[in-house]
UniProtKB/Swiss-Prot annotation:
GO terms for biological process: tRNA methylation; tRNA wobble uridine modification. Belongs to the MnmG family. The keyword Manganese does not apply. NAD(+) binds at residues 274-288. InterPro entries: FAD/NAD-bd_sf, GIDA_C_N, MnmG, MnmG-rel, MnmG-rel_CS, MnmG_C, MnmG_C_subdom, MnmG_C_subdom_sf. The lineage of its organism: Bacteria, Pseudomonadati, Pseudomonadota, Gammaproteobacteria, Thiotrichales. Its cofactor is FAD. It is found in: Cytoplasm. It comes from Francisella tularensis subsp. holarctica (strain LVS). GO terms for molecular function: flavin adenine dinucleotide binding. GO terms for cellular component: cytosol. Coiled coil: none annotated. This is tRNA uridine 5-carboxymethylaminomethyl modification enzyme MnmG.
Length: 627
């Protein structure tokens, strides 16, 4: 049965990538259908009950700057907020929030259920309608065909999903959900490179069986920060509660090493490679055998939940072994496991087969986002869903495209890494992956991206007004401070000198004075003659960072200008690299396989040398491809 409701975009999957994808295309104005196997699990946190962290928090802020829902949802559902690296520079500071699972899912649903242009339908997708190498729709398990101009696949770990607890394995997309085996088989029949990855989750523990008195208490920050640039004064956080910290010990490690042969990972049952930066407890004990203990964060699953998430104890060991090693840990001596931990392996598709828009190179109008591309994490998934669906929506009746770059966002770093380097293990974002960290800060994500969001129609009128007002306030106040001079013999100078290490000897602007480490905006405000009455903390923060890091920021902007030349030089999709004399067979093979869209993208493919880029540039100039 064919249902042609005139959909522009179909999004398959209601996880974190799917939610951002469906919301983005609908906000732009595309008639959007979200297909999910279960409406009740839309926005569900399948693994850890938290949003953000190092690198990940930056992604959430960028999603928010583009009008996404993740930051607002966690502001509505967060039960503990912390700024990580708060004593370090602004480039590496990151927000992290503990979530109430129930409240988070409720928040997500409240945001998308009120979204215009968005329909939601419950059914699994088993097949795609593909005509002349172009996707035209999706076919559900019950035989319904929905036609659309674009399809975005955000299917998480459901493609060929297999759950492992010890040597017991069963098919599943996650605990309690069936996998998408028919869709996995269909995708394998298409000309994509496919492989397997693995991830895992720890056992859940009944909080009533835990002794918190012997654990370290971890409180959130006060005042409580907000994730969204648009939440303050509009959204009230739920009640805030602490997390706890405990540690494994030698007994824990002995129990695990004595039973490694029973682990699905170590017995050879699992083919897929697991996440390097979120390893199972078995991996940690083996890889870091010299460590006497490993830190475990004991995280509540919600204000009204009795379940605890022991972050750091992901496992594929048998249930009996899980019980034994859990009870060897301080505070868990009488722990009752409510849900066993498990590992899950699933299909992913080589992201080098994608364009920077996340459209596939082999099937037109088909986009991949999230774990299907080899990433791990809610934040990485949401970022990809956003970009994929933006491009699906804006290219419906034109050849328009937009994608972030390494110079303007961590989302750009994420996508560029995936499409140029691919991945052999679940990819996680870190600040260390970015070249321009001082420019790509959490605090200025809106200043970097919200202008584009306004242009694309992604922000509500209210959020647009908030952003424009903030941006104008920053510009106006910085200009004023750069044009306000203080002479060394004035009363203002004498008032200032109580904050300075030495007397003023020359005339300085307020902006230059703010560059000094001993001066901040609040001290300048104490000088009544200056009439500095600004009260907006977010605006003040941008003024201070602009002053104190001005030299470094200028240097990074110059570096960006140098690399921008290559990024602007497009390579035609049908370019014949064999005509370029001097390219090695390895370089020729890689360029032909990956079909980079720009010289900049080509330069970042592993194995592509600067000499090869020079040869390519010279040839393209000679033949008129670039000027």
């Amino acid at each position: 049965m064919i249902y042609d409701y005139g959909y522009d975009v179909i999004v398959v999957g209601g996880g974190h990538a799917g939610v951002e994808a469906a919301s983005a295309s609908a906000r732009i104005g595309a008639k959007t259908l979200l297909l999910t196997h279960n409406i009740d699990t839309i926005g569900q946190m399948s693994c850890n009950p938290a949003i953000g962290g190092i690198g990940k928090g930056h992604l959430v802020k960028e999603i928010d700057a583009m009008g996404g829902v993740m930051a607002k949802a966690i502001d509505m559902a967060g039960i503990q907020f912390r700024i990580l690296n708060s004593r370090k520079g602004p480039a590496v500071r990151a927000t992290r929030a503990q979530a109430d699972r129930v409240l988070y899912k409720k928040a997500i649903n409240s945001l998308i259920n009120n979204q215009e242009n968005l329909d939601i339908f419950q059914d699994s997708v088993d097949d795609l309608v593909v005509e002349n190498n172009t996707v035209c729709g999706a076919i559900t398990k019950t035989g319904i065909t929905f036609r659309a101009k674009k399809v975005v696949l955000t299917v998480g770990t459901f493609l060929g999903g297999k759950i492992h607890i010890g040597k017991v394995s069963n098919a599943g997309g996650r605990a309690g959900d069936q996998p998408s085996n028919a869709l996995a088989a269909r995708l394998r029949s298409l000309p994509f490179r496919v492989d397997r990855l693995k991830t895992g989750t720890p056992p859940r523990i009944d909080r009533r069986s835990v002794d918190f008195s012997v654990m370290e208490v971890q409180h959130g920050d006060n005042p409580t920060p907000y994730f969204s640039f648009f939440s303050k004064g509009k959204i009230e956080h739920p009640r805030q509660i602490p997390c706890y910290i405990t540690y494994t010990n030698n007994e824990t490690h002995k129990i695990i090493t004595d039973n490694l042969d029973k682990s699905a990972m170590y017995s050879g049952l699992i083919e897929g490679i697991g996440p390097r930066y979120c390893p199972s407890i078995e991996d940690k004990v083996v890889r870091f055998a010299d460590k006497e203990r490993h830190q475990i964060f004991v995280e509540p699953e919600g204000l009204n939940s009795i379940e605890l998430y022991p972050n750091g104890l992901s496992t594929s060991l048998p249930f009996e072994v899980q019980c034994n090693y859990i009870r060897s840990i301080k505070g868990f001596e009488k722990a009752f496991i409510m849900r066993p931990g498990y590992a899950i392996e699933y299909d992913f598709f080589d992201p080098r087969d994608l364009k920077p828009t996340l459209e596939t190179k082999h099937i037109k109008n088909l986009y991949f986002a999230g774990q299907i591309n080899g990433t791990t994490g809610y934040e990485e998934a949401g970022a990809q869903g956003l970009v994929a669906s933006i491009n699906a929506a804006i290219s419906i009746d034109s050849d328009k495209s937009w994608y972030p770059t390494r110079a303007d966002s961590y989302i750009g770093v994420l996508i560029d890494d995936l499409i140029t380097k691919g991945t052999k293990e679940p990819y996680r974002m870190f600040t260390s992956r970015a070249e321009y960290r001082l420019i790509l800060r959490e605090d200025n994500a809106d200043l970097r991206l919200s202008d584009k969001a306004c242009e694309l129609g992604l922000l509500s009128k209210e959020d647009q007004q908030h952003f424009i007002s903030k941006k104008n306030a920053i510009i106006e106040n910085i200009a004023m401070m750069k044009n306000t001079w203080i002479g060394p013999q004035t009363q203002k100078a004498r008032d200032l000198e109580k904050f300075l290490d030495k007397k003023m000897t020359r005339e300085s602007t307020l902006f230059d004075l703010l560059k000094r480490p001993e001066i901040d905006y609040s001290k300048l405000q104490q000088i009544s003659e200056l009439n500095l009455n600004l009260q907006d903390d977010a605006v003040i923060e941008q003024i201070e960072i602009s002053a104190k890091y001005s030299g470094y920021i200028e240097r990074q902007n110059k570096d960006i200008e140098k690399t921008a030349t290559l990024e602007q030089k497009a390579i035609p999709t049908d370019f014949n690299y064999s005509q370029v004399k001097g390219l090695s067979n390895e370089v020729l093979q890689k360029l032909t396989e990956q079909k980079p869209t720009t010289l900049g993208e080509a330069s970042r493919i592993p194995g592509i040398t600067p000499a090869a880029i020079s040869l390519l540039t010279i040839y393209m100039k000679k033949t008129g491809f670039i000027k």
